[in-house]
């Protein structure tokens, strides 16, 4: 119900972070208790982690109002919550705009949440030496499953199949914490599927032998000429399926897009290795701000 009003605030500033993507917000909104407040300049976030720590993220407002909205967030933390301000995933442009005094704040880069940005055309074609291995895996998939695979777009009506796939996909993960993470993600995916008429996104899927084996969700922001990919899942036992859905989704859904943001690696070694293997053209740095 708040989507349209929140979307207006999200359009005021467009840093290239996944966190500035409203689709990403709604997929992960149920992870922790989260609320917001507004004034005539912007929207300010407050969230509470499992261990009871309060934190915020960069306000949604125009550049010229950022300092005012930042201080409004700090005031809420100090006066209402009786806490020092902690703000995560702050983009570099915001840090530069805020010009925070060193004697009052600690500002530190956080590699864990840096986003990976790619040349979209390279991901469509996997051309060049750097993508030789990806191209080999992709071709192996096409050879192995020739005549047996199909790319499709999915929608709300496919929700049961998508949720069943996520349950199966979870079996490949042994970590209990990761299971909770996947369950939370599934709740968010269910929400955007059930409200597809208000969200602007596309879901691509790959079927092998008429069975759903991979799906991905993405949306496009014209101001950055950027596709954002908050979700991509594939059966890890099918060689070349991940490169195939990555490439084919861009070809079918966003053929003209210049860049793709594939989000952060959450500090997970395996995920970092995977994201680096797609050869990002740059990283979107993010910072943590802590009030002293």
Regions of interest found by a model, annotated:
Residues 1-28:
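Generic N-terminal amphipathic/basic segments
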Residues 157, 161-211:
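Short, conserved active-site entrance elements at the starts or edges of catalytic domains
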Residues 86-87, 150-152, 259-262:
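Short catalytic-loop micro-motif centered on adjacent basic/acidic residues
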Residues 200-290:
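Aromatic (often tryptophan-rich) hydrophobic motifs at membrane interfaces
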Residues 108-116, 281-292:
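Conserved catalytic-core motifs of GNAT/GCN5-like acyltransferases
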Residues 94-108, 136, 267-283:
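Conserved active-site alpha-helix within GNAT-family acetyltransferase domains
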Residues 102-176:
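Acyltransferase donor/substrate-recognition loop-hinge adjacent to the catalytic core
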Residues 18-93, 98, 207-238:
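Conserved donor-binding loop and adjoining core beta-sheet/short helix segment
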């Amino acid at each position: 119900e708040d989507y349209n009003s929140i979307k207006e605030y999200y359009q005021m500033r467009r840093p290239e972070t996944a966190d500035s993507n409203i689709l990403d917000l709604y997929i992960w909104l149920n992870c922790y208790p989260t609320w917001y407040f507004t004034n005539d300049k912007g929207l300010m976030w407050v969230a509470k982690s499992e261990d009871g720590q309060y934190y915020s993220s960069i306000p949604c407002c125009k550049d010229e109002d950022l300092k005012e909205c930042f201080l409004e967030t700090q005031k809420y933390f100090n006066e209402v919550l009786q806490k020092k301000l902690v703000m995560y995933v702050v983009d570099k442009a915001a840090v530069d705009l805020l010009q925070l005094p060193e004697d009052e704040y600690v500002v530190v880069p956080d590699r864990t949440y840096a986003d990976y940005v790619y040349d979209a055309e390279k991901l469509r074609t996997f051309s060049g030496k750097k993508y030789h291995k990806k191209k080999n895996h992709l071709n192996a998939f096409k050879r192995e499953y020739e005549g047996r695979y199909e790319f499709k777009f999915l929608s709300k009506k496919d929700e049961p199949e998508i949720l069943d796939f996520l349950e199966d996909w979870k079996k490949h993960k042994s970590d209990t914490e990761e299971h909770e993470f996947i369950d939370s993600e599934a709740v968010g995916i269910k929400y955007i599927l059930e409200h597809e008429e208000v969200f602007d996104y596309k879901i691509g899927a790959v079927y092998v032998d008429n069975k759903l084996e991979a799906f991905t969700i993405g949306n496009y922001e014209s101001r950055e000429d950027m596709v954002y990919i908050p979700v991509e899942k594939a059966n890890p036992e099918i060689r070349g399926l991940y490169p195939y859905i990555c490439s084919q989704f861009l070809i079918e859904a966003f053929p003209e897009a210049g860049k793709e943001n594939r989000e952060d690696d959450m500090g997970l070694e395996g995920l970092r290795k995977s994201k680096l293997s797609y050869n990002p053209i740059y990283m979107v740095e993010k910072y943590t701000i802590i009030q002293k």
